[in-house]
Amino acid sequence: MALEIHMSDPMCLIENFNEQLKVNQEALEILSAITQPVVVVAIVGLYRTGKSYLMNKLAGKNKGFSVASTVQSHTKGIWIWCVPHPNWPNHTLVLLDTEGLGDVEKADNKNDIQIFALALLLSSTFVYNTVNKIDQGAIDLLHNVTELTDLLKARNSPDLDRVEDPADSASFFPDLVWTLRDFCLGLEIDGQLVTPDEYLENSLRPKQGSDQRVQNFNLPRLCIQKFFPKKKCFIFDLPAHQKKLAQLETLPDDELEPEFVQQVTEFCSYIFSHSMTKTLPGGIMVNGSRLKNLVLTYVNAISSGDLPCIENAVLALAQRENSAAVQKAIAHYDQQMGQKVQLPMETLQELLDLHRTSEREAIEVFMKNSFKDVDQSFQKELETLLDAKQNDICKRNLEASSDYCSALLKDIFGPLEEAVKQGIYSKPGGHNLFIQKTEELKAKYYREPRKGIQAEEVLQKYLKSKESVSHAILQTDQALTETEKKKKEAQVKAEAEKAEAQRLAAIQRQNEQMMQERERLHQEQVRQMEIAKQNWLAEQQKMQEQQMQEQAAQLSTTFQAQNRSLLSELQHAQRTVNNDDPCVLL
């Protein structure tokens, strides 16, 4: 079962010391332990605008993230709070509170943009917190960070000036939730009441025209529209009387403005129900461990002066996870074989059957824990390792069988060898007695269980090594005529040749069996690779269809908003005309 992490308080995830970013290892360890999918909500905005208050509410607490009550910025770097998702079982809600932008104590805004960019890259829902109204400054700031040619790269391409496919680019970005604090304006456009979402869409609507002034006005709006096809806007009244704002986090709800309390409730409800699980290109679901790796990749890139590249981050993540998936698969194989196999195995087929079962389970473990292994390089690596494992277990089985059989022969034939040394068979009729005893001991050897596949091989080698002993006894046997001795020698030779032929035939059968097993393994690997490829292609198709549906929905929403705006303009124009009509008296 996926592990659920409970953090009683937030902690720093990315430290910002002297405008240098550094990852907090303790926070990374917490992320590593989260095996559940994560919903990542990050908030960014100017300092002293109440970001931390909203994040505390999302955590279901009044206190946690530092809420400032002075003109200095409190939160430094990026802080994290992992809590159980209130709506989705087996999901973890990861809240990221960021250092306030625009701190006058900073030398320039480079550090601000780095923190802004990290929040964008890590989140599945990005909360942009501004004050009073949507103005050009807020739009320009959001545009400056989201513009790929300035800071973010979707692909690892040297051509940073090429135009990105809007659907492709948008898939890398989170959903946008724009929060307007201390909103005191009327939600009205051209005399018509509008919703916060309509107010946002109107603020981002480009103007008609082609002169430079219009282009400068439209560029950031088009960029935001492209990168954030899914947008939501919330407005918040002033929470309480000015004198009480310094104690905002300690004020009970009944001392806050009712409208503000209701607005915060609606905001939290929307985040809980609409914020999606963090996913990467290709539909890769992010858990705590993957989020940790993304943090490391992005911070290292920014700290080294490189552009954070989403494709590189995904590839680096795939490298780490697929390499770990290979190790998990091999560990599972070793565990299963260790439990099932007792060397020596009686037959090669029995051993190969156990290998085949453990191999299939190992591949399933790999497929479950790997992702984006597009060229199957890691699966091929696993197959190479499994092939080596098969060769090794077969070799060890041979050695175990040989060792066991050698020890068994020593135990069974030891008394006979001692009798030969004492000259018991060096007498008339001794050779027949020796052969008779040898056959009895061979029968005893054959009756012993669990000798393994080297039983005949080891026996024949042993008997061959004792041919000189048999020949010496035969030569000293005075009871046999010369003709009988030659006949005996021919008989012994024929039996030895027959045994050698049987030994070679057994080796040939084993080799053929191993070749057939390797061919079967190859065909199974090809089949598994084809399944993995088809699954990946199906996932890509699913993602493309989902993107097209989202684009269509966005276009429909935009079209409807434009129609409403046009209708409002027409109605306003009609009222103006009616008001200007002259009154004619007859």
From Swiss-Prot:
GO terms for molecular function: endopeptidase inhibitor activity; GTP binding; GTPase activity; identical protein binding; molecular function inhibitor activity; protein homodimerization activity. Isoprenylation is required for proper subcellular location. Induction: By IFNG in endothelial cells and in LPS-primed macrophages. Its EC number is 3.6.5.-. Residues 529-586 are annotated as: Required for tetramerization, but not for dimerization. A lipid is attached at C583 (S-geranylgeranyl cysteine). Expressed in peripheral blood monocytes (at protein level). Changing C583A: Loss of isoprenylation and of localization at the Golgi apparatus. Impaired ability to restrict HIV-1. Its main location: membrane. Residues 584-586 form a propeptide. Keywords: Antimicrobial, Cytoplasm, Cytoplasmic vesicle, Glycoprotein, Golgi apparatus, GPI-anchor, GTP-binding, Hydrolase, Immunity, Inflammatory response, Innate immunity, Lipoprotein, Membrane, Methylation, Nucleotide-binding, Prenylation. InterPro entries: G_GB1_RHD3_dom, GBP_C, Guanylate-bd/ATL_C, Guanylate-bd_C_sf, Guanylate-bd_N, P-loop_NTPase. Residues 1-306 are annotated as: NLRP3-binding. GO terms for cellular component: cytoplasm; cytoplasmic vesicle; cytoplasmic vesicle membrane; Golgi apparatus; Golgi membrane; membrane; perinuclear region of cytoplasm; side of membrane. Signal peptide: none annotated. GTP binds at G45, L46, Y47, R48, T49, G50, K51, S52, V67, A68, S69, R181, D182, L245. The modification Cysteine methyl ester is found at C583. GO terms for biological process: activation of innate immune response; cellular response to lipopolysaccharide; cellular response to type II interferon; cytolysis in another organism; defense response to bacterium; defense response to virus; inflammatory response; positive regulation of AIM2 inflammasome complex assembly. Homodimer; homodimerizes upon GTP-binding, forming a close face-to-face dimer. Heterodimer with other family members, including GBP1, GBP2, GBP3 and GBP4. May also form tetramers (dimer of dimers) in the presence of GTP. Interacts with NLRP3, possibly in its tetrameric form, and promotes PYCARD/ASC polymerization. Belongs to the TRAFAC class dynamin-like GTPase superfamily. GB1/RHD3 GTPase family. GB1 subfamily. This is Guanylate-binding protein 5.
